[in-house]
């Protein structure tokens, strides 16, 4: 009973955030109507991509040295992508207001696995990136002595080939991802309560995204209810909580529910591997592995 987790923290004047996510894996956003949600008596604000653009908070870096939209604006690119963020006086009202946001989508062809994503005729997902012509997130990485490996296979008396699929796995921590962002407009100090596995890296990201000096950001990590790697990345919900606190001037708490965690948290693995191993005289002499990693 001595543990102190994010959900144990209550700050004066704290409000609550909830995230609207896309039901589609790939679709254009035709329109977003937040008027009914804003009319809810307990709703303080509804944040969309346009609002974040005004604040200079529309984009964020990712753990794979890429960038992504904090909230989808013109298009959604994966199922569960964040579309709008509601801030209300209590958690129930925030979640109720999500149902009042009307988003019109124009569904597009989707890519459902990494191998098909590399097909020449696969739909281009990151068409927002200048010069992007395929669905490779990073350059092809190679290691080893190709010439020696080719020679080993040419001289081998036995070659074994296998196709191996290492499925995607979910870390499923007991405590889901969440944050309390508390921005003080008088001092410019941002206090963050957040159980994460990389607080110094998070501070750097928040400074970059929000335009604050790192020494003006203080991250207070309480006990972490499990992480297993999925509490290393920065999630859009964190940035939205910070944006909400900057706009409202009060603490904003966002915690994903279990369904959100299962859908949208950081997954691992999902490898498609083609492997060849060769031997000569009973001794392994060469190995080739082609890996597609999602």
Which residue stretches match the model-derived regions?
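Gly/Pro-rich active-site capping loops and adjacent beta-alpha segments
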Residues: 93-117, 136-144, 162, 201-202, ...
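Residues that act as N-cap/strand-start positions at coil-to-secondary-structure junctions
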Residues: 31, 70, 173-177, 271
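Short gly/pro/ser/thr-enriched loop/turn and capping motifs at secondary-structure boundaries
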Residues: 52-56, 225, 261-262
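Flexible, low-hydrophobicity surface segments
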Residues: 1-136, 159-162, 237
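Glycine-rich and small/hydrophobic secondary-structure elements
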Residues: 63-94, 228-281
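Alpha-helical support elements that line or immediately flank enzyme active sites
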Residues: 19-49, 85-104, 179-248, 293
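General beta-strand structural signal in soluble alpha/beta enzymes
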Residues: 1, 45-49, 78, 160-162, ...
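Helix-loop-helix junctions that connect adjacent transmembrane helices in secondary transporters/permeases
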Residues: 123-210
């Amino acid at each position: 009973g001595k543990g102190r987790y994010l959900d144990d923290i209550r700050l004066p004047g704290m409000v609550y955030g909830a995230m609207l996510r896309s039901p589609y894996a790939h679709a254009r956003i035709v329109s977003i109507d937040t008027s009914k949600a804003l009319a809810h008596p307990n709703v303080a604000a509804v944040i969309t991509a346009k609002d974040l653009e005004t604040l200079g908070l529309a984009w964020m870096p990712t753990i794979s040295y890429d960038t992504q939209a904090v909230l989808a604006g013109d298009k959604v690119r994966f199922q569960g992508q964040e579309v709008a963020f509601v801030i209300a006086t209590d958690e129930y009202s925030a979640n109720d207001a999500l149902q009042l946001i009307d988003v019109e989508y124009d569904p597009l062809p989707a890519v459902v696995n990494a191998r098909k994503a590399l097909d020449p005729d696969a739909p281009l997902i990151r068409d927002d990136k200048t010069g992007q012509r395929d669905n490779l997130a990073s350059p092809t990485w190679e290691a080893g002595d190709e010439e020696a490996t080719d020679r080993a296979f040419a001289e081998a008396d036995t070659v074994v080939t296998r196709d191996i699929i290492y499925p995607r796995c979910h870390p499923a921590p007991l405590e889901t991802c969440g944050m309390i962002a508390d921005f003080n407009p008088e001092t410019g100090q941002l206090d963050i309560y957040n159980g994460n596995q990389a607080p110094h890296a998070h501070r750097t990201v928040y400074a970059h995204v929000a335009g604050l000096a790192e020494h003006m950001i203080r991250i207070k990590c309480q006990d972490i209810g499990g992480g297993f790697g999925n509490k290393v990345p920065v999630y859009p919900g964190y940035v939205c909580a910070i944006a909400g606190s900057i706009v409202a001037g009060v603490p904003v708490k966002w915690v994903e529910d279990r369904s959100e965690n299962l859908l949208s948290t950081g997954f691992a693995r999902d490898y498609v591997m083609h492997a060849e191993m060769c031997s000569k005289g009973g001794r392994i002499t060469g190995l080739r592995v082609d890996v597609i990693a999602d």
